């Protein structure tokens, strides 16, 4: 049986042969053990039975290149000019990525011309008149203490040819793009346009999504911080719910199409009785539906805590077709919908409740990263630099099977990772909450 992993092309494009000895070689005493060969791979599928089956069939298991410094590099650091841009919504850890990239370029490779592009892809377009920032270790030294993005950001597409024109004018040899799925698709188009012009510009993506929904990336930066802070909101909601007869704490968390934050935070703070996510359908009415199940929970225990991802339950709304600046379909407010539906249901039952709705979304997005995410961002940023210095392009640096790897942009862009309703994470939620299917029949 062919798995989805076997069809993934894991080859990483390169601008040319890497012939320059890495300056890291002079600094490190570990010798060759410090460097990573392109032949060093990380298996995509870690299931031993499937690996044996693939090998017996005479095939080679699919694997990603392992990330890390190469002994030979493509670019001459003394003549190199680099650009870095952050795009899309805010996320804890953006400043950590910026800092890690700058420090590795400056101290690791001796690059002195590093430019920060202001306000996302707008910064490349002359009509917006955004200034470029010279990035040095002094400039980025303490930015990890702050939330948001030191360079600013923006949403929405910009003309690819204008972006490449700007890169040519600035004589950029290396572009680091930090962003989510839309940014990675834009990065793919930019890399293609660069190749069509026969330019020697490396494009390296660093995946950013607080929802942790980038395909072929097991963990994205900011997710750990989001879960950490979300558990505080769950704790607050639990205290509110227990403080009143028939108390209900309702927490709306981020997750447009993927419920990883809601599910993981619920498991981290196991006071949650219901978890509603986009990947798992549920009914509102009927004996097996959410409202009747909530009523039974209150009758049994006197309080309840509900966690809902922002993209859950969209079937209960009429489609408007409206989209935001990034092209995403505008979601209806499931938090307000549930609050109204719960209040109406128990009012008709003449059952008094105390309902509190908590939405920490924007607080979470704009916070500084926690310590775990800071470490993760450092690895991502430095490995992105190593990949670019080796002349690799149209690549993103990701985390897979507990290793940092090179993922082709074409393998990830335009696809989404979601919670598997039959997987271990969701089964753990069902065990922890006891909520059942919340479906009739």
Q: PLM features: residue spans?
A:
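Short, ordered loop/turn segments at secondary-structure junctions
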Residues: 87-89, 117-122, 155-156, 180-181, ...
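Glycine-rich oxoanion-binding loops at beta->alpha junctions
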Residues: 39-75, 123-173, 184, 219-228, ...
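N-terminal phosphate-binding or glycine-rich loops at protein starts, especially the Walker A/P-loop
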Residues: 1-26, 75-125
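Short glycine/serine/threonine-rich phosphate/pyrophosphate-binding segments
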Residues: 91-101, 124-125, 158-163, 181-189, ...
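Short glycine-rich or small-residue beta-strand-to-loop segments that form or flank ligand, phosphate
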Residues: 81-91, 149-152, 173-179, 205, ...
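C-terminal non-catalytic interaction/assembly regions of soluble proteins
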Residues: 1-33, 322-441
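Accessory alpha-helical/coil subdomains and C-terminal extensions
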Residues: 166, 177-179, 184-200, 204, ...
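Gly-rich Lys/Arg/Thr-decorated short loops/hinges at beta-loop-alpha junctions or inter-strand turns
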Residues: 77-85, 123, 141-151, 208-218, ...
